[in-house]
Amino acid sequence: RAPAAVVRHGATTLQRPPTTLLVEGRVALTIPADWSTQRVVSGPGSARVQVTSPADPEVALHVTQSPVPGETLPGTAQRLKRAIDASPAGVFVDFNPSDIRAGRPAVTYREVRAGHQVRWTILLDGAVRISVGCQSGPGHEDLLREVCAQAVRSVHAVG
């Protein structure tokens, strides 16, 4: 566990919550230490780890991983675009095949579900495709902006 960091901006002091390193399968990332983790292997979407805020169950991170030897980010974008185009209209929106998130090249899109949305960032690290989904209620993306940026910035393949 990393200790809380104090960041000073002028006369204001902001306390950053403690973090921990989550390692799951071939992937590791930094998450808030007090958020709960759960493996989700059923229901819609890919098998994933869900990391949920203790303050609001609608605020969560989702992390998926897939081995993709030889895949490129443009290839990932084409594959995702085909899947999105085959889905019901309005569920997957704001597709960007060549975005930058937390300083990293990524494919991004937003998943819209009843009561919440998930902003997905898809990265390649070697032969592993990593997807980080940042879930919040509509209009409440600010509740996890820093947590999401930290997850995307820190996520990487291990082993």
Feature locations, PLM:
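N-terminal "mature-domain start" segment
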Residues: 8-43
